[in-house]
Amino acid sequence: MNNQYIRREVFCCGTCHELKSFWEKEISKQTFYRELEEDRQERSALKKLREEWRQRLERRLRMLDNPVEKEKPAHTAD
């Protein structure tokens, strides 16, 4: 289990400063984990593959919507 999901028991040690610093550390950890995950997703090939398949499907749909075939000019040898 990932340690970011572990329940934290917070006991006030007498000062608000300690409590504030505890939560600032927790927030910075969560921000760090989120940034790592975003970086991992950006490096993932899945995004690129999805875009390629989306383009292929769009081309396929355009081709099916416009079935007019372009005729190749016939080369005549004179």
Swiss-Prot record:
InterPro entries: FAM240 (IPR040261). Belongs to the FAM240 family. PANTHER family: PROTEIN FAM240B (PTHR40387:SF1). This is Protein FAM240B. It comes from Homo sapiens (Human).
